């Protein structure tokens, strides 16, 4: 055995110390205890924040959701098959963020903002946290500007304002998505940017929506955030929050945006799945206790902010402009049960709801909106002049018709006034029908509603009302373009326009017999 001198020992120690690599980076690392169904239990992560991104050994990211004394429960944002017990996990020190900005317009991205449309990488470096606190009361402004959906039934009876949350609720396959897509298509010339968030839908359905938006030239002002049925529950849970952050980019810079969540029922189911796997106590319908907060903190971010807020946010770059984010959440009911847990929650959070009914849809009334129980709590202040003036009579005519129609089933002989009201109501009901992907301008809607209110439809055969409307609008566009321009997108309405519309309709009625 070789003997070492004391001096040699000190030299060896010195060399070892010189070679020692002392890194200044302190890593907060933990170890995976278990992996199952996209949920990972981790031991040893000391300084982790709620909602913080954590990185796994295979490069996949996760999000910390359960912070317990001895362990951390996290959801994996992506594929979890490569993860195994004993692998190292490290904190990133960052809250989950997604890309935002104009570069996203026209693109299809996943819940993390990664492009999935095969059009290459995004060119921007601007990001925003997925979870943000909604603007306070002082930062907000009242809703007084309209969002035109282009659908007569909605713009007349349940008007939507910029910054409003209007729920679209109904059973499956009765046109909820169709209403939202028509609203997006109608924003082509309004400057409103749109975000369509697809949660838990078939990939074929999402592809069909994207194709329709492209066909109608609406993809240029739209971002599609897709979390399909095959995506992990964590991605379906995050998609609405990611889409909202993208919409807030426009709102906070003094622009207007519209976001559609299709649909929040599937997001609630995904969150229920995550919560049960994280062993959180189940409540009503096995949903966790904070499912109301899940949707309230999301929908409160849709708002109209005042000019001071925008100026402060942009450091004085944008002055004198208000911004808005309008939300159209969709909820799917089971057999028309609107008293279930999630539907009642979202009804109480939103500023109104559009009820779509199966029996109306099956009887050919599309959009299948029940005008009696559909309501807009704040949109009335945002309605254009012509719609406000004419819309009330339309709602009244439909309400009277519903009441009399039920009564007329049992009465054999009706007096003249009742019969007239019934016939008028039938024609107004027929007039509210509208084909998909054919939104109307404010001036066109105003003309048609004026015709109904002034009795120009009363001598038209019920089966010819739709034909009458189409031919009237074609005639107005060719013969009375100046009058339509006078009404304009602002919905102007005065004595001159009233006289002009009366004269035009009388002239049109003489062109052929109805």
Curated annotation (Swiss-Prot):
GO cellular component, one term: plasma membrane
UniProt KW Ion transport keyword: yes
UniProt-annotated location(s): Cell inner membrane
Any coiled-coil regions, as ranges: none
Organism: Marinobacter nauticus (strain ATCC 700491 / DSM 11845 / VT8) (Marinobacter aquaeolei)
InterPro entries: ATP_synth_asu-like_sf, ATP_synth_asu_C, ATP_synth_asu_C_sf, ATP_synth_F1_a_nt-bd_dom, ATP_synth_F1_asu, ATPase_F1/V1/A1_a/bsu_N, ATPase_F1/V1/A1_a/bsu_N_sf, ATPase_F1/V1/A1_a/bsu_nucl-bd
GO molecular function, one term: ADP binding
Matching Pfam families: ATP-synt_ab (PF00006), ATP-synt_ab_C (PF00306), ATP-synt_ab_N (PF02874)
Annotated SUPFAM superfamilies: C-terminal domain of alpha and beta subunits of F1 ATP synthase, N-terminal domain of alpha and beta subunits of F1 ATP synthase, P-loop containing nucleoside triphosphate hydrolases
Name listed for the protein in its UniProt record: ATP synthase subunit alpha
Source taxonomy: Bacteria, Pseudomonadati, Pseudomonadota, Gammaproteobacteria, Pseudomonadales
Keywords: ATP synthesis, ATP-binding, Cell inner membrane, Cell membrane, CF(1), Hydrogen ion transport, Ion transport, Membrane, Nucleotide-binding, Translocase, Transport
UniProt keyword Transport present: yes
Catalytic activity: ATP + H2O + 4 H(+)(in) = ADP + phosphate + 5 H(+)(out)
Site (Required for activity): 374
Subunit structure: F-type ATPases have 2 components, CF(1) - the catalytic core - and CF(0) - the membrane proton channel. CF(1) has five subunits: alpha(3), beta(3), gamma(1), delta(1), epsilon(1). CF(0) has three main subunits: a(1), b(2) and c(9-12). The alpha and beta chains form an alternating ring which encloses part of the gamma chain. CF(1) is attached to CF(0) by a central stalk formed by the gamma and epsilon chains, while a peripheral stalk is formed by the delta and b chains.
UniProt binding sites for ATP: 170-177
Top-level class of the enzyme under EC nomenclature: translocase
Disulfide bond positions: none
Physiological role: Produces ATP from ADP in the presence of a proton gradient across the membrane. The alpha chain is a regulatory subunit.
Gene name of this polypeptide: atpA
Membrane topology: Peripheral membrane protein
Protein EC: 7.1.2.2
Similarity section: Belongs to the ATPase alpha/beta chains family.
